Amino acid sequence: MTQLPTAGPVIRRFDMSAQFTALYRISVALSQESNTARALAAILEVLHDHAFMQYGMVCLFDKERNALFVESLHGIDGERKKETRHVRYRMGEGVIGAVMSQRQALVLPRISDDQRFLDRLNIYDYSLPLIGVPIPGADNQPAGVLVAQPMALHEDRLAASTRFLEMVANLISQPLRSATPPESLPAQTPVRCSVPRQFGFEQMVGKSQAMRQTMDILRQVSKWDTTVLVRGESGTGKELIANAIHYNSPRAAAPFVKFNCAALPDNLLESELFGHEKGAFTGAIRTRKGRFELADGGTLFLDEIGESSASFQAKLLRILQEGEMERVGGDTTLKVDVRIIAATNRNLEEEVRAGNFREDLYYRLNVMPVSLPALRERLDDIADLAPFLVKKIALRQGRELRISDGAVRLLMTYSWPGNVRELENCLERASVMTDEGLIDRDVILFNHHESPALSVKPGLPLATDESWLDQELDERQRVIAALEKTGWVQAKAARLLGMTPRQIAYRIQIMDINMHRI
């Protein structure tokens, strides 16, 4: 690799001085290095050391295969780097494919908030931004895409960072126009759109008959462009289902856009859905695409459709019927090709009868209904679901975690009114209370409003005289009542409730019970 002039200590603030220094060193690399691969490696190193950018990557476009391949990558070495030779992105696929097809920069303020990010390299920090810019090429067709991740979250600097990367892309465009992929795959290698692992059908855990039937429907639905209405209680995983349908469908390489129908007042809905032209209203300083345009060619997920107003329903019905729309303040009719997946926890049939939901919109949406069973209807699935969720929590926390068989059996005694979301919250709460990496019964705490049917360990005696205990009390009140009954002696109260001392101590701490009464 070309040795670049020394420029003092690494710059840790991305300001004008850092930009000029980085651009100067990049120009030196391009002028001194005739080998394209080595020049790109030097440029990405400059972005890391002098522009506060990590995991820089250059993907080049292969016309024969109509796909992008990874030409240069900074931040990983050895075998992991060799594996990137087989990574490909189709036009419009993921962030990189979207930058290539749209021929414009794309900024994700946080990777975790954007479903287009595919994470095929498994190196990026989900809490930080990602910036992709097209590298100019011949015939108005980008030669490839330059991608980098800022090392810190400074949303006010994203625009400046994007402009800087666009300048870098322009600098490297000339040598890249004549570049050919040095290590391209054989011509017969297919370019395939892979499903992001977090959205695969393997995320739908359960062997119960209800889940098997749901999975059979999902696999069939994913093959076609049919409108889908996902129904189920809060916390059953409706958004997860929508993700799985999209990313296992023929539209997987296109955008997946989410919109919560209850999140905005009516006066903002039209602009959010259909976009607006510059000057359409006070504050419209630029033209803005709406959710339908952003989802063109892909899928639009309309969450909480049952909460929408009559005005919103009328606007939505028009575009579903005609496939056409105009931006607010515009007179040009735009055609959009969007698959609709809607979700609700309401009984829409009752809402239609009550006049709260348009009957014609109901029939437009209810082409292929998918009903998700409540967790209480498939308690046996917890045997597989709990370890699966514990593994996810362990990955987030960066440590080893296990769950005991006894804890799983205890979880299966609860009715889970909050469904899978409540189960995951319960397990994460338990994980915080264990230092040994084992989630056991004594750190399982259910929500206060409902206790499990069998919340005690086998062999521990329950109090036989329960005249002192109001069975309508929630769990916190039951613990306080037992403590008052026993003079605030924890060991005695634990025996009265059929708990271990550790269990009651844990509940006293979590439930914020004041022990200073004695």
Curated annotation (Swiss-Prot):
**Single Gene Ontology MF annotation:** sequence-specific DNA binding
For the region Inter-domain linker, what residue ranges are annotated? 433-475
Chain segments carrying region C-terminal DNA-binding domain: 476-518
Answer whether the UniProt record assigns the keyword DNA damage to this protein: no
Q: Which CDD domains match?
A: AAA
- Tell me the ranges covered by the GAF domain, including all copies: 35-176
Task: Locate the DNA-binding region by residue range.
Answer: 490-509
Q: What keywords is this UniProt entry annotated with?
A: Activator, ATP-binding, DNA-binding, Nitrogen fixation, Nucleotide-binding, Plasmid, Transcription, Transcription regulation, Two-component regulatory system
Residue intervals of the Sigma-54 factor interaction domain: 205-432
Cite a single GO BP annotation: nitrogen fixation
Instruction: Tell me, in a sentence or two, what this protein's role is.
Output: Required for activation of most nif operons, which are directly involved in nitrogen fixation.
PANTHER family (alphabetical): PTS-DEPENDENT DIHYDROXYACETONE KINASE OPERON REGULATORY PROTEIN-RELATED, TRANSCRIPTIONAL REGULATORY PROTEIN
The UniProt subunit note reads as follows: Interacts with sigma-54.
Can you say what this protein is called?
A: Nif-specific regulatory protein
According to its UniProt entry, this protein's organism is Enterobacter agglomerans (Erwinia herbicola)
List the gene name: nifA
